Amino acid sequence: MAVAACGPSTTPSGPSPQPTPEPAPAPAPPSPTPPVVRAGFPGFDTGIYPGDAAMRTWRETSPYVWVGYYLPAPCRRDVSWSGKRQTLAGMGWGTAVIYLGQQDWAAVPGRAPAPRDTMPRDTVRRDSTARDSAAAPAAPPACSSAYLTAARGTTEAADAAAKTAAEGFPAGSVIYLDVERVTAVSPALAAYVRGWIDGVLADGRFTPGIYCHRLDADALRQIARAAYAARGRAGDAPFWVASTGGFTLEQAPRGVGLDYANVWQGRLDTPETWGGVTLTIDANVADSRSPSSPR
């Protein structure tokens, strides 16, 4: 019987097999960008209508959901916004109707008193068309502190209501009377504002509101409340208040420091670019998606 030889095996052997490497873990998906939480509804205003293409681009790419809608008015005669309501509504824009009535130019901070028969050359709303028209010798004066009377306020309220109706805004829509910043609300300005509010209430089709600076808001609110009470109208006039302190688009309108503010304008004459289109705007936040919608 054969016996196996002692000693190391002579059978050749190859390298030991290596374990298959584990695949690298897939990278974690990026964390989703948290949605922007807003307490109000951002909107903007700008003096001249930017054009349909620009408005469509901004509606698709910007955070803004409503826009100021200027009526032709004594201190702002440009008509570029006229006839655009349906176009803007079709794009999804809300609106805030603005009427720039008579102003107490002598009381505007930093402004020299204007001639009584012409509109100031540096009109607040950047309206070169209105300035040129007002300065033309053949044009009768339309914007003058000489017209700060209750009777004129009532007459121009009728004008504002007629133009708002002609633009197709529904009954109950808010028309904001633009009252630019003053050092103090004079008796003449108070009379004009009271007459204008009373005139819109008497017309019955629309709701009078006020645009003003924060420092003038309380005085103008008292005037508005008195006019509402005299007509037996419950509630307050809507207020659109301007003040730049602490403003962001995420704020609610009451962040301006007034609990009755429905709109806060907090960024002025600022160039912004959305979708490749640059506009110079005033930025606002409102308590509704369309600040002139019937309340």
Q: Locations of the language-model features?
A:
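Functionally critical loop-and-helix segments that line ligand-binding/catalytic clefts
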Residues: 30-47, 55, 225-295
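Aromatic-lined carbohydrate-recognition surfaces of secreted/lumenal glycan-active proteins
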Residues: 201-222
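Glycine-rich, charge-decorated loop segments at or immediately adjacent to ligand/cofactor-binding or catalytic sites
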Residues: 105-114, 216-228
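Long, well-ordered alpha-helical scaffolding segments within enzyme catalytic domains
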Residues: 188-205
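N-terminal low-complexity, Pro/Thr-rich disordered segments
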Residues: 6-39, 115-116, 121-133, 137, ...
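Substrate-binding cleft of extracellular glycoside hydrolase catalytic domains
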Residues: 34-55, 60-65, 69-192
